[in-house]
Amino acid sequence: MRGFASSASRIATAAAASKSLNASTSVNPKLSKTLNSSGKPTNPLNQRYISQVIERKDWFLILNQEFTTHRIGLNTRFVISVLQNQDNPLHSLRFYLWVSNFDPVYAKDQSLKSVLGNALFRKGPLLLSMELLKEIRDSGYRISDELMCVLIGSWGRLGLAKYCNDVFAQISFLGMKPSTRLYNAVIDALVKSNSLDLAYLKFQQMRSDGCKPDRFTYNILIHGVCKKGVVDEAIRLVKQMEQEGNRPNVFTYTILIDGFLIAGRVDEALKQLEMMRVRKLNPNEATIRTFVHGIFRCLPPCKAFEVLVGFMEKDSNLQRVGYDAVLYCLSNNSMAKETGQFLRKIGERGYIPDSSTFNAAMSCLLKGHDLVETCRIFDGFVSRGVKPGFNGYLVLVQALLNAQRFSEGDRYLKQMGVDGLLSSVYSYNAVIDCLCKARRIENAAMFLTEMQDRGISPNLVTFNTFLSGYSVRGDVKKVHGVLEKLLVHGFKPDVITFSLIINCLCRAKEIKDAFDCFKEMLEWGIEPNEITYNILIRSCCSTGDTDRSVKLFAKMKENGLSPDLYAYNATIQSFCKMRKVKKAEELLKTMLRIGLKPDNFTYSTLIKALSESGRESEAREMFSSIERHGCVPDSYTKRLVEELDLRKSGLSRETVSAS
């Protein structure tokens, strides 16, 4: 491939010059600076400026001044963005304190409390130090009950059970009185921090503080005991809450269903669903997902499927979300046969899955279901309005091409175009790759022409994909043609490009040209990777050039690259041919040390070499270690050892066979 470097260099230089001319040389100074010389914000006020303000000790004064003077309006999205993007949780708290006092609407916004809670959890813990309490007092603000609930919630998620308890015991010093809301926050935090006993203690203290447990209190405790698998206690709590006039809701029953399934009590979980029906409580999406996933979690997959199908026959409450959950579980467990059965059954009921659920189900079917039947199911759902999407079509096309059902694969490729799914270089590249791997490169070339006719320019990945297809064939002429197109389009070859060209030359037995290309690669300043070296090492070994393969192996390790199994095997074989068995054994030890499992080729090569060098006992010892290192001996490896035993007894295989 001489001349490759010079022609590519000319095109690369021109491309670099073009990029330089098109580059922007100036930046809008108003956008690059957030503070002017006087420390005032640029207009409009931006998030970075706010972040700088709340780092200061006089943050509340500046915020009040800026938002009053400039009359800059706040909106929920902006507030959320500021809260989320602070590295210090104290800054998130400061901004929330200010904004919730500046406009009472934000104090009632549940989404802001959730965002603040997440920020305090991710960056925290933020503890109530004396300095922080003084700062809040000096700012003229106070910690409200709602804010205290957010803080307690973050501590609970961080596992600070004792701290939650200690702070709650001293809330009177913060000007607060115990309330059911605060008790609920503490009990929830204690449950989340795995301190159920302490949560029960707080539950028992509520009434002495004049706070009556409500439905939230009971649901929190029921959730805690169900997580532990103590479902009988959960049932007792449900009875107690009913006696106090707190009727269980959908969340209560969802928690109970999950608890019974965690405990493996499927029948009891089904009874809870029946109880919901009797009480005219409709299961929500969380209930149904909990039920389906719980059934699959506590029963063997086939039994779980049987239970759910039986439930579906009796009760129509499974709904669409239930069908989605069942399909997800079937796909996740690679149950192709059951997935096909379920799709047919729910399809008859008019169920139409969304694209992601359908694609997951199709991927499962393609791994183990009859391909013709899979296509029939696919076509049936598409005719009813399902939109499989690009990936849904592509996995089916790949399966058909692998099965050499080319006409059917082409039909779906055509439909992808009709549905407008081929609209970018990325989608075309995926189709071209699919066709190249199926050895249908001529068809792939048609898609290249089509994409260019539509004004979609190929990229380097496109050309590398074609190089990969022709490289496997060892078609040097075609590879050269693709390379010329790649350069004409102004692309600089990368390590993948060079490796594919080298692989093609090696497959065509043009080893000298392969090493010339390797040299040009280095001249271009492109560092070879493991794949490049492994290709050359294997090729040298296959042509008997053992010296060069050993040198490449050493160079590869010198550059910090890890040879693969095939490179190790090829080098071990080279050493054995050179009668340097000790070096070959050292490589085997290296493989085991770095966690690379030798295969039967590795062991048979060494066993044969040890045997031929008169080291029969070591050959047998190596054979006995094969299974210990995670490899099952094949028939050839076993035969080598059998011949050793026969030789030792003075017999030949032919003599044994004749007798």
UniProtKB/Swiss-Prot annotation:
Keywords: Mitochondrion, Repeat, Transit peptide. Residues 1-32 form a transit peptide. Signal peptide: none annotated. The keyword Repeat applies. One of its GO terms (cellular component) is mitochondrion. It comes from Arabidopsis thaliana. InterPro entries: Pentatricopeptide_rpt, PPR-containing_protein, TPR-like_helical_dom_sf. Transmembrane segments: none annotated. Pfam families: PPR, PPR_2. GO terms for biological process: mitochondrial ATP synthesis coupled electron transport; response to abscisic acid; response to oxidative stress; response to salt stress. The lineage of its organism: Eukaryota, Viridiplantae, Streptophyta, Embryophyta, Tracheophyta. It comes from the Eukaryota. PPR repeats lie at residues 109-143, 144-178, 179-213, 214-248, 249-283, 284-318, 319-353, 354-388, 389-423, 424-458, 459-493, 494-528, 529-563, 564-598, 599-633. Belongs to the PPR family. P subfamily. Required for the ubiquinol-cytochrome c oxidoreductase activity of mitochondrial complex III. This is Putative pentatricopeptide repeat-containing protein At3g16890, mitochondrial. It is found in: Mitochondrion.
